[in-house]
UniProtKB/Swiss-Prot annotation:
UniProt name for this protein: Uncharacterized peptidase MW1651
Top-level taxon of origin: Bacteria
Pfam families, per the entry: Creatinase_N (PF01321), Peptidase_M24 (PF00557)
Cofactor(s) this protein cannot do without: Mn(2+)
PROSITE patterns: PROLINE_PEPTIDASE (PS00491)
Residues the entry annotates as binding Mn(2+) 2: 215, 226, 333
Cofactor: how bound: Binds 2 manganese ions per subunit.
Record keyword Transmembrane present: no
Organism: Staphylococcus aureus (strain MW2)
GO molecular function terms noted in the UniProt entry: hydrolase activity; metal ion binding
Known EC number: 3.4.-.-
Record-stated family: Belongs to the peptidase M24B family.
UniProt binding sites for Mn(2+) 1: 226, 290, 319, 333
InterPro entries xref list: Creatin/AminoP/Spt16_N, Creatinase/aminopeptidase-like, Creatinase_N, Pept_M24, Peptidase_M24B, Peptidase_M24B_aminopep-P_CS
Amino acid sequence: MTKISKIIDELNNQQADAAWITTPLNVYYFTGYRSEPHERLFALLIKKDGKQVLFCPKMEVEEVKASPFTGEIVGYLDTENPFSLYPQTINKLLIESEHLTVARQKQLISGFNVNSFGDVDLTIKQLRNIKSEDEISKIRKAAELADKCIEIGVSYLKEGVTEREVVNHIEQTIKQYGVNEMSFDTMVLFGDHAASPHGTPGDRRLKSNEYVLFDLGVIYEHYCSDMTRTIKFGEPSKEAQEIYNIVLEAETSAIQAIKPGIPLKDIDHIARNIISEKGYGEYFPHRLGHGLGLQEHEYQDVSSTNSNLLEAGMVITIEPGIYVPSVAGVRIEDDILVTNEGYEVLTHYEK
């Protein structure tokens, strides 16, 4: 069943006439055309009969025509009201309720004479949750490039270098491999600074005998990777190395349990129980992982409260961590494809 067919099914389920999609990544997912319109209207209308209409600034029309999108295009000037160019009466409209602003909703009421709204967010999340072979190949390449980033960063480590210098070196060097954009702000944290799970790289200088935490990802043809490695520089303290071994055991055990039909919360419990049994439960303050695709964090989450089941075609992260102030912060993260038989680890830098 195609993506559009799934939306039409949801329109029928909710007795709605059309769906209105405005999140740029979701529009790209359905059309193959990517735009960042800022304040301008950029939206895809999917009607119950399968017709698709893309609203975009007139200056982008030729780009849309060159894209895979084959539906109708409504291009508008900045001085025009887009709705006046495509007059419609839509009794019930499905929207991305988590994203659509009140101002845009008012425009829809007046522009399309909408009487009521429904939600299409969950349907889109469920579609994006299961990756196609093409999407998987792009994520696999993004993961390969993330491995390269770690390699670049580790090779640059030397006593006295700052966190910020290592970040800059990684992001400049990886451009030689065709990477134009990182998935998120690259994180490099030294020693006990890594005890802040989302710390900001700064001017802290690397000292002998401490761990270095790398958390990074790249975007390849719109798809993200996201991986973390914690690397020894010299011989860290006995407690820091003990923490590392516990995190590695938790991650390995959780990954080995992945297969279709297993509740996501069970995977979280496996890692969390190992860390708790070793006395560090209070120092693992976040969920075990999350979905990965067009965004570095997307549906679904790997958490203790998510009873949904793993399915073949999902790509998730597994990233346990222990963060002890004044001692060390250790996190290890891999990107995992759920396969029919079990799993495939997409990130490969040594641990």
